[in-house]
Design a protein with these regions (language model features):
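Conserved small/polar residues in nucleotide/adenosyl-binding loops
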Residues: 1-5
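A long, amphipathic alpha-helix that forms part
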Residues: 119-132, 147-165
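Structural motif
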Residues: 139-143
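Short amphipathic alpha-helices and their capping/turn segments at secondary-structure boundaries
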Residues: 15, 22-27, 120-136
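Active-site-proximal alpha/beta segments of enzymes that process anionic O-linked groups
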Residues: 27-29, 42-124
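Gly/Ser/Thr-rich active-site loops/lids in small-molecule metabolic enzymes
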Residues: 19-32, 161-165
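Short, solvent-exposed amphipathic alpha-helical segments in soluble enzyme
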Residues: 14-20, 51, 159
Length: 165
């Protein structure tokens, strides 16, 4: 069963959305009863088995309420994980919360660049920690994309190389 909402929503929209126009749907069944594991987003007219649980106070909000500065860093492949998902479904940063997103490389397969943007992320985190008097981060959230993205390639050697930053 697939429970991640970040990719399943596109497929669900292709089946449900009346104004879907990203590709031509042939033999489109008009009378579908669509059930999803989770609620993907407002406006998708599907039945939901497990409605979203509202996170009352995400960690980032709690840290912000304490008056602490924080940084969430990743590359674009995992941007939603250090912003939207970590913040309980909210993309807007809290006071004192900095999002630092590095563009992922445009390649056919990440096996060809197993380090992805990890060295840049590593170096930026080290730079900001060393400059604590400038940034004053009390919390840093880092998501290295390459273990996950390389795991999907099935290329074991590239996955190992990508994790040796």
């Amino acid at each position: 069963m697939y429970k991640r909402q970040d990719r399943a929503r596109e497929l669900t929209k292709a089946f449900i959305s009346k104004d879907f126009n990203h590709f031509v749907r042939r033999n489109y069944p008009e009378n579908l009863y669509v059930v999803t594991m989770t609620g993907y987003e407002e406006g998708i007219d599907a039945h939901v088995i497990f409605p979203p649980t509202k996170v009352k106070t995400p960690i980032a909000e709690y840290i912000s309420d304490l008056g602490f500065k924080q940084m969430h860093i990743s590359e674009t492949e995992k941007q939603m994980h250090v912003t939207y998902f970590f913040n309980g479904g909210v993309e807007k940063p809290h006071v004192g919360e900095d999002f630092f997103i590095i563009p992922s490389q445009k390649v056919e397969s990440y096996a060809s660049v197993p380090q992805m943007s990890s060295p840049i992320i590593r170096d930026e985190v080290v730079r900001r920690v060393k400059a604590y008097d400038v940034y004053n981060y009390k919390f840093i959230l880092i998501n290295f994309a390459n273990p996950d993205m390389l795991g999907h390639t099935g290329n074991y050697d590239a996955t190992v190389r990508g994790n040796e930053i």
